[in-house]
Amino acid sequence: MTTNTQYIYPIFTVRWLAVHALAVPTVFFLGSISAMQFIQR
């Protein structure tokens, strides 16, 4: 279990970081755009 965790840990961390690095700014971008449109109206 220890060897498996050490082998899988970095791969999952990189993938988790990549997914969140793309998903978080996208949600923030969409939210800010919709907020700006609501405020301007």
UniProtKB/Swiss-Prot annotation:
Q: Does the keyword tRNA processing apply?
A: no
The protein's UniProt keywords, in alphabetical order, are: Chloroplast, Electron transport, Heme, Iron, Membrane, Metal-binding, Photosynthesis, Photosystem II, Plastid, Thylakoid, Transmembrane, Transmembrane helix, Transport
What membrane topology is given? Single-pass membrane protein
Needed cofactors, names only, are:
heme b
A molecular function (GO) term: electron transfer activity
Q: Which InterPro entries match?
A: PSII_cyt_b559_bsu, PSII_cyt_b559_CS, PSII_cyt_b559_N
- GO cellular component: a single term: photosystem II reaction center
| Stored SUPFAM superfamilies | Cytochrome b559 subunits
Its biological function?
A: This b-type cytochrome is tightly associated with the reaction center of photosystem II (PSII). PSII is a light-driven water:plastoquinone oxidoreductase that uses light energy to abstract electrons from H(2)O, generating O(2) and a proton gradient subsequently used for ATP formation. It consists of a core antenna complex that captures photons, and an electron transfer chain that converts photonic excitation into a charge separation.
Q: What is this protein called?
A: Cytochrome b559 subunit beta
- Native source species: Nephroselmis olivacea (Green alga)
